[in-house]
Amino acid sequence: MASPKLHDFRHIVVKVGSSLLIDSAAGEVRAGWLAALAADIAELHRGGRDVMVVSSGSIALGRSRLKLPRGPLKLEESQAAAAVGQIELARTWSEVLGAHGIGAGQILVTFQDTEERRRYLNARSTIAKLLEWRAVPVINENDTVATTEIRYGDNDRLAARVATMASADLLILLSDIDGLYTAPPGNDPDATLIPVVEAITAEIEGMAGAAGSELSRGGMRTKIEAAKIATSAGTHMLIASGKIDHPLRAIAEGGKCTWFLTPANPVTARKRWIAGTLEPKGTLTIDAGAVSALRAGKSLLPAGVIRVDGQFSRGDAVIVRGPDTHEIGRGLVAYDAEDAEKIKGHSSPDVMMILGITGRAEMIHRDDLVVGTAPT
């Protein structure tokens, strides 16, 4: 199968690892390289694409600033180093993107932010708003609070979760190697690059090597795990070398890389997850006007809700029924049951007055809603 083209994609997550971003000898950001990458991001941005960055580097920068000795760090040492390094990392991204007139928005996430539906919706909404404002979200694991037991452990899998959460259609993992080889190329001179992976088989998994360097917690195995997460959610993924200047331009020009393809798309995969995987915790009954709006692809507004049943929390799946009690669809609700009961039947501007906070305009956003076919 022919490889896709970079410019075929509109919503792109780029993962940048510590070993690329930080000069390990000097303990400093590789400023020239990062400026070249920022220029690549700006080019995609000018083309109307949404670009998100998952950036490692906070611990590496922090240990350099604090002049910590080489070798493994204890958990509390890593957390403290991240606290120092994160400030500089955020400033660095703000400066290099700002040079192209692009705002950068820092988002620090923990494992629970992508695994718990309420927090998942919060993070997803923040990313969506930054993209709407044409800013570039710069995302990293919040290493200052993450624990050994509850963490991603590497930014490859974090990037895959972010791509899934943001419904990205492409995840790019920039690495110190230009793709997946049939064997570790450093050990086997006959190893060949695999340009396209259509399915992640046991054979493909067996080709992955072991872990990375002192700066990087990731290796090829974690990249294969990331590919599983991404492709199952309808996101294509590629691994390419980030050691060169302008790595995204090189990909666009047909440079070496490995594509992991998926037959699905992010919206289809996400809606299949909502419709078929999540257990509904309640029911919203809506009026005929709201039924028509949903079938036309609109979001469900509080004004269209006439009844609330069940005990559910924000982010839970609920069933949506029409006035005749027939199921219209399912979705992730933006309010808990108590608040939904208070604002049902009211227009969106009334929500703030009723709840005393600035709530969301939608009871269920259309991206979080699966509507069945209309009865014939």
Curated annotation (Swiss-Prot):
One Pfam family it belongs to: PUA
Recorded superkingdom: Bacteria
Any GO BP: L-proline biosynthetic process
E.C. number: 2.7.2.11
Gene Ontology molecular functions: ATP binding; glutamate 5-kinase activity; RNA binding
Enzyme class: transferase
Pathway(s) served: Amino-acid biosynthesis; L-proline biosynthesis; L-glutamate 5-semialdehyde from L-glutamate: step 1/2
Recorded catalytic activity of this chain's protein: L-glutamate + ATP = L-glutamyl 5-phosphate + ADP
Locations listed in the record: Cytoplasm
Domain PUA intervals: 281-358
Positions of substrate binding: 56, 143, 155
Binding residues for ATP: 15, 175-176
InterPro entries per record: AceGlu_kinase-like_sf, Asp/Glu/Uridylate_kinase, G5K_ProB, Glu/AcGlu_kinase, Glu_5kinase, Glu_5kinase/COase_Synthase, Glutamate_5-kinase_CS, PUA
GO CC terms: cytosol
Keywords, comma-separated and alphabetical: Amino-acid biosynthesis, ATP-binding, Cytoplasm, Kinase, Nucleotide-binding, Proline biosynthesis, Transferase
Protein family membership: Belongs to the glutamate 5-kinase family.
Described purpose of this protein according to its UniProt entry: Catalyzes the transfer of a phosphate group to glutamate to form L-glutamate 5-phosphate.
Protein name: Glutamate 5-kinase
Gene behind the chain: proB
